[in-house]
């Protein structure tokens, strides 16, 4: 069990129950899954998709799936069935391991980092943020990066409101800017 998972079970749940918002430990919101997505413009180079797949596998510890376009969009030069990105969904132990590395190792490596934007919530308790450079993750070898792809990180919680989700993520160690 990762340190973040233990911290959640022992400290975060107790603090949220003591705050008076929840009467039962099972009512406390929890992180359900983390979705990592890399959108890739692979029109010109075919190896960009495989490179993105390898980097996302290195970062997440799980093999990502290739996402294909559902419809053709002429303005974007996208045809139906073309690979447009890679995605991986983390749950359970891998999710907590990733979040621990993300909060403690990756986010502080962002240049001029002052905390994550608190406006990234969707109204239903999920938080999404974009990462412009995959080199912030310690697992990625800098000399092997050919393309700076970036990614979207979505943290899905069981919270009903954004305030509950923000409180949960703040107690887990996510550094929000003020």
Please give the residue ranges for each predicted region.
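Ribosome-associated RNA-binding proteins
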Residues: 1-178
